[in-house]
Amino acid sequence: MKRTTRYSRKYVPSIDGLRALAVIAVIAYHLNFSWAKGGFIGVDIFFVLSGYLITNILLTQWEKNQSLQLKQFWIRRFRRLIPAVYVMIVVVVIYSVFFHPEILKNLRGDAIASFFYVSNWWFIFHNVSYFDSFGLPSPLKNLWSLAIEEQFYLIWPAFLLVFLKWVKNPKLLLKIVIGLGLLSAVWMTILYVPGTDPSRVYYGTDTRAFDLLSGCALAFVWPFNRLSPVVPRKSKAVLNIAGTISILCFILFTAFVSEYQPFLYRGGLLFVAILGVIMIATISHPASYLSKIFSFKPLRWIGTRSYGIYLWHYPIITLTTPVLEITQPNIWRAILQVAATFIIAELSFRFIETPIRKNGFINYFKGFKDKNYFIWKNKPVGKWLSIAGVVAVLAIFTLGMSNVLSVNTNAEKQQTSVKTTTSTPDEKKDDKKEDKATKDKEADSNKASEQKETQKPDNKNKSAATPKTIITQTVAIGDSVMLDIEPYLKEAVPNITIDGLVGRQLRDAITTATGYKKFNSENSSVILELGTNGPFTEDQLNDLLDQFDKATIYLVNTRVPRGWQSDVNKSIANAASRPNVTVVDWYSRSSGQSQYFAPDGVHLTKAGAQAYVAMLTSVMNK
């Protein structure tokens, strides 16, 4: 394969600057900053960059030896990636044993899948969403992207070796790579279902291959060790303009794109990959002014440690953020979390990643074994303390990964008991005095909040416009929150029909509603409580509301500590423009009321269920 003049560039500092930009975007996204709701696209930049750099290495190796030396390549990759991630997994499991035992049951499977770099498929097959989950998210969920990269490192060199041996035409080879990337992007479009959680297409190696292959394609036409530092003025201007536009587009995507926007999975992420190609091409070019900007020393420091930063930031954030505050970033907590991430990443870089990458596993452990950090009475006490510490760590890790610790059962019982207290009608009789006291205590706050709930511009004076219709039948359709309030709602609204289902999403309710056609009449009221389990489009919401266009609809908004909360509530607020729809504002009513929620921050305690029903019936009785 003919290539242009070689320039001596084994290290491109601006590439580390680009890594820094990508990892900062990802951290800001996981901290739930409103200005970085699209920060997840930083992972796409990492993918494109990996494809570019690895293919550069392999093509250079082929030019030298007409061989890819796959064994040496894979050993180098394992040295670079495995030690740090294995240490992180062990530390997270041990930390969870002591401080978050309730997550151990699910964490075991996540850890094993992460050890073998198949966590992305593990999350797909176990329906673990990247964008949402009730309760404390898995602290290992960020390892899905490393799983894809490791799978790429195993598969791509073998494919490339076949291509290089059998496809002699470089243009044809480039077309094959581009074609495979386009097939991956089309496959994502085919699999994606609007209004549903996009995690299947987001996690899948098959549906994310276009990111990596975009970088691979760039390596064929833009090898960084062939880029001349001297170019014509016009070419330099093109580089600078294209690079600036691509950076601005990346910033705009980071600030304004949401993970639930359908266009992302219908070509949007492919566009991000193309942006990544342009960013890499311009930032890596020595003639570009962006190359100098991204070689700024602080950016390079972050970039060289970006692997450790990416590894550690997510478990640190998830394990130190209260469930109810996941969508409410705290600037001081965020500063401490970022500081802890950088410190641990630096320790990992100095004492784990760099020594093993340079010296290999055997020499690293041999050197560790031969060093005596603490001598007492001519005895290597430090060595034995180190060995004892390693044994203790492995013992605790083994216990955490086994079923010996039954803490998960206790956590499950706690969550089950929450549901039982809100689902057993008999308990209401025993606790009648308590219920009355609770209602009296909340009466004043209910009045104030309920006035706010029903006097918003879209709902105001709806009942005054027409004579009040006598309601003779009511149906309530919802998810597991509806099951939480069911016994209290039945007591407050006699003869009500309640249809609650765990995990129900709005798209499911559209089908469910067809079975309740008799409630689409002027003397009927319909309560809709949906949005807890995922987002929906306004078209889907309108399809549901259209089925009850003659009935009086009470549409309850949601409080769920997940990213789609604001989008769901915005769609619900827009529906208030319909003359037969009244929005009931549970989001405002439950603000600051942590006692209303179970540990997962979504389902209701007894007090929460009672407050919910009191709010709902107050609005219905107006």
Curated annotation (Swiss-Prot):
Topology class, membrane: Multi-pass membrane protein
Effect of a null allele: Cells lacking this gene have no O-acetylated N-acetyl muramic acid residues on the cell wall. Sensitive to bacterial cell wall targeting antimicrobial molecules lysozyme, beta-lactam antibiotic cefotaxime and Staphylococcus gallinarum lantibiotic gallidermin. Impaired postinfection intracellular survival of bacteria inside human acute monocytic leukemia (THP-1) cells. Killed more efficiently and rapidly in mouse postinfection peritoneal-elicited macrophages (PEM) and bone marrow-derived macrophages (BMDM).
Keyword Kinase appears in the UniProt entry: no
Disulfide linkage: none
Keyword set includes Ligase: no
Annotated EC: 2.3.1.-
Amino acid composition bias (Basic and acidic residues), ranges on this chain: 425-461
Record-given protein name: Peptidoglycan O-acetyltransferase OatA
GO biological process: lipopolysaccharide biosynthetic process; response to antibiotic
Region (Disordered): 412-467
Compartments, as annotated in UniProt: Cell membrane; Secreted, Cell wall
Transmembrane intervals: 11-31, 39-59, 81-101, 143-163, 173-193, 212-232, 237-257, 267-287, 307-327, 334-354, 387-407
Function of the protein: Responsible for O-acetylation at the C6-hydroxyl group of N-acetylmuramyl residues, forming the corresponding N,6-O-diacetylmuramic acid of the peptidoglycan. O-acetylation of the peptidoglycan is the major determinant for lysozyme resistance. Critical for virulence and escape from innate immune response of the host. Involved at both early and later stages of listeriosis in the mouse model of infection. Required for successful host colonization and for intracellular survival of bacteria in macrophages of the infected host.
Biased composition (Low complexity): 413-424
Keyword annotations: Acyltransferase, Antibiotic resistance, Cell membrane, Cell wall, Membrane, Secreted, Transferase, Transmembrane, Transmembrane helix, Virulence
GO MF annotation terms: acyltransferase activity, transferring groups other than amino-acyl groups
Organism in which the protein naturally occurs: Listeria monocytogenes serovar 1/2a (strain ATCC BAA-679 / EGD-e)
Active site: S480, D600, H603
UniProt xrefs under PANTHER family: ACETYLTRANSFERASE, ACYL_TRANSF_3 DOMAIN-CONTAINING PROTEIN
Enzyme class, spelled out: transferase
